[in-house]
């Protein structure tokens, strides 16, 4: 039997604030016991993995070696706009995805949504 990813952990400056961003981005809630020191976001629909946010004293010193790719629920443009209203910042735009950072500078990508793909022919490379 293989291991399962239970949670993904973030080191951050303000655990409750960053958890709030990701909970809103993913359509779920921050655990009611969240503090600026630690916070927990349960995956929507028990689809795992969950997210832990832990306050650490040092700021990030290098580029993320891992990031989330989010599929837009409708269009990429609308999802990028929604995430920006929550505090994310656009870093670079491409036809197939947009690179953003969350409020603490962690990289994430937003990919095309189903409405973007309607009528398009996808070719495997």
Give the positions of each predicted feature:
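Glyoxalase I/VOC metalloenzyme domain signal
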Residues: 1-34, 42-92, 101-125
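A ligand-binding cleft/hinge motif common to bilobed small-molecule-binding domains
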Residues: 38
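Short loop/turn microsegments at loop-to-beta-strand junctions
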Residues: 95-97
């Amino acid at each position: 039997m293989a291991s399962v990813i239970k949670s993904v952990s973030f080191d951050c400056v303000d655990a409750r604030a960053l958890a709030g961003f990701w909970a809103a981005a993913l359509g779920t809630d921050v655990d009611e016991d969240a503090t600026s020191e630690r916070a927990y976001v349960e995956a929507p629909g028990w689809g795992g993995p969950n997210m832990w946010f832990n306050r650490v004293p040092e700021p990030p010193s290098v580029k993320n070696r891992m990031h989330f790719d989010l599929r837009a629920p409708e269009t990429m443009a609308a999802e990028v706009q929604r995430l920006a209203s929550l505090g994310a910042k656009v870093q670079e735009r491409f036809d197939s995805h947009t690179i953003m950072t969350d409020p603490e500078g962690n990289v994430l990508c937003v990919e095309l949504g189903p409405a973007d793909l309607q009528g398009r022919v996808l070719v495997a490379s």
